[in-house]
A protein has these predicted regions:
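Intrinsic disorder at enzyme termini
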Residues: 1-12
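Generic hydrophobic secondary-structure packing signal
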Residues: 12, 16, 86-89
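Acidic-residue sensor for enzyme active/binding pockets
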Residues: 8, 15, 23, 70-71
């Protein structure tokens, strides 16, 4: 069994690690909510890892989401919690059990 990351997953790991080192760690002592970092994470596509492209996702699956979660948590566990909640709770629930109209209306804006 091959446990190596795919090229795509290795790339998202590298991007998430770079983001954590360059953007999160230098600001960790601010001890306040970093709304701009959350916006940047959305722009990069981190929140859409587990979602199909038709909803604005990147189709990296749960493994991609977990990889980003791990890299963010190395820098700031609080931001990791926000990432995990924003990226999986409401949008994933709508994707799995929502109506087609709800999916079209909400998911892309949430991820």
């Amino acid at each position: 069994m091959d446990f190596d990351l795919s090229k795509e997953h290795a790339a998202i790991q590298s991007e998430a690690r770079r983001f954590a080192v360059r953007e999160i760690i230098p600001r960790i002592k601010e001890e306040k909510f970093k709304r701009d970092l959350v916006a940047t994470m959305g722009e990069i596509g981190f929140f859409g890892c587990a979602f199909p492209m038709k909803y604005g996702g990147t189709e990296m699956g749960f493994l991609g989401h977990s990889i980003v979660c791990e890299e963010i948590s190395r820098a700031d566990s609080g931001l990791r919690s926000l990432f995990n909640l924003q990226g999986m709770t409401v949008p994933y629930t709508i994707m799995e059990w929502g109506t087609d109209a709800a999916k079209e209306k909400y998911i892309e804006d949430l991820v």
